[in-house]
């Protein structure tokens, strides 16, 4: 099993990256918490990897920290939660916020995440509440890239939220309520948009 990859970032998007390791390109699925810490394309990158093996496919999931990887593995250990949904959960909630929701049994917060119904939320709390108390979670570090143009930020957030399962019209309405400042980042605008969508 592949557990760690180190190489050059050949391509990045909010859903996956391509990591060039000695001339071999690995497609690695990532959550937003990892996307926001990525260097510019061409930069050096090391990712903690979870390898998902199925009969017809092998998929790689990458994380900047071991803690994120452990949280991902705890999530997919819950019945009904596969790698895609686990990635979506991490994309919609910072690790510390997710842990807080699980420990405190915040079903409303969990159920607001696309793909999670009340029963799945209850199952997550039941199976992970005690494990979350034992797992130390760090806030994801913000990347050091320069701020992109306002429209580019809106486009990135729109694309990311649509890929998470939100309808374009709903996302556009949420973005219309936001004021994107000169120093805004994709991460900041995404968090603000998610707060509006989860009301």
Swiss-Prot record:
One of its GO terms (biological process) is DNA repair. SMART domains: HhH1 (SM00278). It comes from the Bacteria. GO terms for molecular function: ATP binding; four-way junction DNA binding; four-way junction helicase activity. CDD domains: UBA_RuvA_C. Residues 149-199 are annotated as: Domain III. This is Holliday junction branch migration complex subunit RuvA. It comes from Geobacter sp. (strain M21).
């Amino acid at each position: 099993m592949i557990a760690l990859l180190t190489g050059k970032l050949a391509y990045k998007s909010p859903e996956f990256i391509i990591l060039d390791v000695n001339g071999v390109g690995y497609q690695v699925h990532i959550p937003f918490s990892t996307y926001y810490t990525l260097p510019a394309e061409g930069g050096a990158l090391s990712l903690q990897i979870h390898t998902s093996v199925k009969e017809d496919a092998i998929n790689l999931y990458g994380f900047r920290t071991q803690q994120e990887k452990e949280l991902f593995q705890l999530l997919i250990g819950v019945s009904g939660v596969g790698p895609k949904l686990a990635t979506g959960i991490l994309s919609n909630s910072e690790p510390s916020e997710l842990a807080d929701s699980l420990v405190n049994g915040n079903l409303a917060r969990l159920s607001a995440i696309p793909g999670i119904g009340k029963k799945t939320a209850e199952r997550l709390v039941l199976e992970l509440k005690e494990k979350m108390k034992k797992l130390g979670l760090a806030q994801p570090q913000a990347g050091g890239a320069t701020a992109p143009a306002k429209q580019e930020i809106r486009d990135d957030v729109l694309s990311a939220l649509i890929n998470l399962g939100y309808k374009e019209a709903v996302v556009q309405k949420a973005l219309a309520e936001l004021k994107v400042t000169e120093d805004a980042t994709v991460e900041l605008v995404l968090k603000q948009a998610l707060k509006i969508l989860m009301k």
